[in-house]
A protein has these predicted regions:
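Short, amphipathic alpha-helical segments
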Residues: 1, 19, 249-252
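Serine/threonine-rich, low-complexity intrinsically disordered segments
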Residues: 5, 22-26
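Bacterial N-terminal signal peptides that target proteins for export
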Residues: 1-12
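A residue-level marker of the well-folded mature domains of exported/periplasmic proteins
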Residues: 26-373
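Hydrophobic core
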Residues: 13-22
Length: 373
């Protein structure tokens, strides 16, 4: 009996070895993973487009058979809720967590827990101080403020009264961009900040705050605006006031602002609006997903994945008539705006990149994948 049992054990062991040997790389690649996307707040089109792009990337031929599930959650401006969502994602078997963190420090404990469980944690756009993350994908936020501030200073010839509008107070992105901008303005003694208010990264809020400031000070006391959100509504307030010449604005990359910078009459909404625009790339979340699978496949990434953030002026503005993948490739991803009939004025338009070549403007609008991708 002992001999028989020993023989059975040997046979089973050999069979197990044979099965292991027969597992091919393609079969190993068939393993599917749970992906979670955690955003610190919602309510603006930047994050809506960012999560749409992640959704679209997850449905491309490259990744659709490798993802068991994609879960997208928003903490709605509550860091404690976001920490709870991260912990719950870990307990439910997440392999990848992509995160736009609401706080640079309040999530560190939850992130460490995820790292200890072997979860790939990648932050995008907004940063955290916890060093265990796999990588952060984003821009140089200081330059995000400094670059547009320098552009506005040049448009004003180094002097004038400006309104200064940040984003959401206390968020790392807001803090660093504001510091970068004010550092530049400090070098121009002729530029004075005469009013300051938060835009909350919401065009409606920006419009309300700007209307209050203009009502209190009058248009003649204002020479320009630096803002993280609101250049388009700033121009609309001037149009409504029937001002002949628009004041320069430096701000983010909404489609309305970018269209307004185009030559008047070239497309509906074009106003020859003087300004400089630098939008934080929205495709960073989708790119983060590709980096997560790069790590799963044995590749390596640095702790900070810096992505480009071009400065858009009237001189280098390019309108894409369709915004589909074919046109993006033909124009070498130089498009800075699309017609307002395709994407509304409050839609953040920096949604495409050669680093995410499977996606187009419609991927950001609705999470769809271009044909063949």
């Amino acid at each position: 009996m002992k001999t028989s049992l020993r023989m059975i054990a040997l046979v089973l062991g050999a069979a197990a070895s044979l099965c292991t040997a027969l597992i091919t790389p393609s079969m190993a690649d068939a393993q599917k993973y749970k992906v979670f996307v955690s955003t610190g707040f919602d309510g603006n089109t930047w994050l809506s487009a960012a999560t749409n792009l992640v959704t679209a990337m997850s449905k491309t031929k490259t990744y659709k058979d490798r993802i068991e599930s994609l879960t997208i959650q928003s903490a709605r401006g509550d860091a404690q809720v976001q920490a709870q969502q991260i912990n719950a994602a870990v307990e439910s078997g997440a392999k990848i967590i992509l995160m736009w963190p609401f706080s640079p420090t309040a999530l560190n404990r939850a992130i460490r827990h995820a790292c200890e469980k072997g979860v790939i944690v990648i932050t995008f756009d907004s940063e955290v101080t916890e060093p265990c993350i796999t990588t952060h994908v984003g821009i140089n936020q200081d330059y995000g403020g400094a670059g547009t501030a320098e552009g506005l200073a040049k448009l004003l010839n180094g002097k004038g009264n400006i309104i200064f509008m940040g984003g959401i107070p206390g968020n790392m992105v807001d803090t660093r961009r504001n510091a970068g901008a004010k550092g530049v303005f400090a070098e121009y003694p002729g530029i004075k900040i005469v009013a300051e208010a938060p835009s909350m990264w919401n065009p409606a809020t920006a419009r309300q705050k700007l209307a209050e400031i203009v009502s209190a000070k009058g248009w003649d006391a204002i020479d320009g605006l630096w803002t993280q959100t609101g250049c388009y509504v700033f121009s609309q307030l001037q149009v409504e006031a029937k001002r002949d010449k628009l004041l320069p604005c430096a701000g983010n990359g909404t489609n309305g602002f970018r269209v307004s910078m185009l030559s008047k009459g070239s497309t509906p909404g074009a106003l020859n609006n003087p300004g400089v625009s630098m939008g934080s790339p929205i495709w960073v979340g989708a790119y983060a997903l590709t980096l997560a699978f790069k790590v799963i496949d044995g590749g390596s990434v640095g702790k900070f994945t810096l992505v480009p953030m071009p400065l858009v002026t009237q001189e280098n503005s390019v309108l894409c008539e369709k915004g589909d993948l074919q046109e993006l490739i033909a124009k070498k991803y130089s498009c800075t705006a699309v017609p307002l009939s395709i994407a509304p004025d409050n839609f953040y338009i920096d949604v495409v990149s050669p680093l995410t070549p499977q996606l187009d403007v419609y991927s950001a609008l609705s999470g769809t994948v271009p044909a063949g991708q």
